[in-house]
């Protein structure tokens, strides 16, 4: 679908009403299987989420700057992310790259997800769990977002898949953050470190429950 949207990117901060709209939209998208036209359209686009990983590689040579609490759990994290590929399949709509800059708060439509270059199908938890670290970076506490994931239908329906996906996602961020900076994107690795830290704080809360 092509449409003209008039508005800014949403505000993910705790004082904004935008996160509530986003979670309501995620609930709507994940509440039922993807319609046949969507499934047909994305049939040739395999989910990149199933290939997310990082902890197993970090386990072979733990980085010196890795938090000691995480270093002590590398075996557990590697085992957890190894379960994700077997859980990565599903029949729900998956945006695949959900961040504030891939959304527009249209003055008439409200929050709308845009840039569906990675659209595919998969379990309901992917987009909601991907968004969770972004909300922590925007100022929400890990404890608040952990409760939200415990309660939201997209992630509460299959908590095992949600935790395994978060493990794979945060491992991916930690691994990539330690690669050489690519030319033309000087702030990328610093951003990846921040989102890795946010995601790991959330993952640790889930693992400790």
Task: Give residue ranges: language-model regions.
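Hydrophobic alpha-helical membrane segments, chiefly transmembrane helices and signal peptide h-regions
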Residues: 1, 25, 98-100, 105, ...
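Hydrophobic packing residues in well-ordered alpha-helices of helical domains and bundles
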Residues: 19-22, 70, 74, 192
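A general structural signal marking secondary-structure boundaries and capping sites
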Residues: 29-37, 84, 139, 177-181
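An alpha-helical support segment within catalytic cores of ATP-dependent transferases
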Residues: 34-95
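Active-site acidic catalytic loop and adjacent metal/ATP-binding pocket
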Residues: 79-126
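Regulatory N- and C-terminal appendages and interdomain linkers associated
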Residues: 193-209
